[in-house]
């Protein structure tokens, strides 16, 4: 791996610092850039909402703040992954690229996989497993065994601080503040309450769930009236990757040793396979 290359860490559904393999491995040489690709067409697609966009805003603000503690920051590229690849090539730079697998399977197959397949012809590309995703395993009989094995692996180390985060002007990105102004806050909010995003919010939900809210989870998770209080409320955080599924799994195993809600937590453990 050439020493003059810049490591580029691509964020999509892994908006966290802790137990983020792409971020850790991309930070080892301490010469890296962290980029979130904001694709307007993706956010205009079916299943996307203004609520999700504001949840993303929280996640990105917190991620940027945490990256600044590492002498780095979150840069924003506006466009799809094909346009991002063209920008890479046009910059004439030398890069190593780091990705995590995405749980957004359709988008991953159509956009991110295309970028990876093109980029490996020109750059060093590193793709890491995330959340138990098994994209090449067609034998589903072994799926749960492999999932358990991945969850029981050690979490990766925290990322290294950045020593060189100079911005290549040929490679066009914008600041997070500008993204929020032109692409997020420009949408009118037609709601009052929204679930806060970010790793800190995810950690608080996890702790209150283990401490008290999980009581009668196995019964009340299907109740429209009670589920809001007795479910983990972590699905959005798993979807955006603000908290590592492996971290939750390991913390759950420790909690099961002493919890007075063991039967409820065992039900939760089964549903972790589906990120609920």
Could you say what each language-model-derived stretch is?
Residues 1-161:
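Trp/Phe/Arg-rich N-terminal binding region typifying the photolyase-homology
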Residues 123, 142-276:
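Glycine/tryptophan-enriched, flexible segments
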